[in-house]
């Protein structure tokens, strides 16, 4: 019944508090640019005393037995490392290792040439005194540098194995949300619905007890970092109640229009701002309070 729906408001507008039940899958991510730094038959995820990331994930899986725990991975892994991942899945049957390579993200792609050409024509349509000639030259050079077979936004993030690689594909995975588990074709995922939500956690977020059901505003919430009283949205936690959440689609739209878009600040933060019509004259700290994923049973950011 509608009466049961709770609302929260930001800037005078009401938003439903959407419910993530206690079976909503959790997703961790490990994109490894140098698998050779691990043993050839070891799980290629850092697990030191200082940064026990693998243990944190295993701990989450043992506490949250009713949930599926995805580990979204990418890297040139050795066969023995892949076997070690399979053994991990065997030892903890709710852990599902999802290889980036096994998932089709093409529905979120756009040709790089289109992004550059749109930006070039935007510049060229301006009166000459308003044009940024330096930028125009740069865009034309970038356009001519696109290699055949690589005219693709999603492929461009595979070439650079930096932060953008992990951040961009994290956004792609969260657009798929629960569907990611179905597409990975893993045993035991079939009772997920195709539009199921998902909660992404960085591997330095430690779960201490079951999270239970969680309410999030309009179906999305993210981690908020507070330093000296200043808040900022972070992508260390992203929770959505469905696939193709409109806030993440708004972020993707920015990635599709800006030639120098950033997957974290544009793909997540600016997409969320746009979705909730946040404008710069509003109090950013109170917006962060509104969108924050808060939970007493998660110790946040332990690797600081």
Can you describe what each PLM-predicted range is?
Residues 180-189, 197-204:
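Short beta-strand-to-loop acidic/aromatic patch adjacent to the donor-nucleotide binding site
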Residues 168-180, 193:
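Active-site SXXK
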Residues 1-168, 194-304:
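Glycosyltransferase-associated regions of secretory-pathway enzymes
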Residues 178-181, 213-215:
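Single-residue recognition of alpha-helix boundary sites
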